[in-house]
């Protein structure tokens, strides 16, 4: 994920920052509790395509 793109993108629900999860190819929105998929290098920033994060997953990203 290009750092410049990550600096520009925000969560479409909360307008908050996103965290890149390289291992799952997702962009994480802690405030919305959503993970947006990245398909073929392109972030899919649609709420309907995002998956809900579990409490355990949120804890993983708490300090990032």
Curated annotation (Swiss-Prot):
SUPFAM superfamilies: Trm112p-like (SSF158997). GO terms for cellular component: cytosol. Transmembrane segments: none annotated. Pfam families: Trm112p. InterPro entries: Trm112-like. PANTHER family: PROTEIN PREY, MITOCHONDRIAL, ZGC:162634. Belongs to the UPF0434 family. This is UPF0434 protein Tgr7_1374. It comes from Thioalkalivibrio sulfidiphilus (strain HL-EbGR7). The lineage of its organism: Bacteria, Pseudomonadati, Pseudomonadota, Gammaproteobacteria, Chromatiales.
């Amino acid at each position: 994920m290009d750092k410049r793109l990550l600096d520009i993108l925000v969560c479409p629900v909360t307008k908050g920052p996103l965290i890149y999860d390289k291992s799952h190819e997702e962009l994480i929105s802690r405030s919305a509790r959503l993970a947006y998929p990245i398909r073929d290098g392109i972030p899919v920033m649609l709420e309907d395509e995002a998956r809900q994060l579990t409490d355990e997953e949120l804890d993983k990203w708490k300090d990032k």
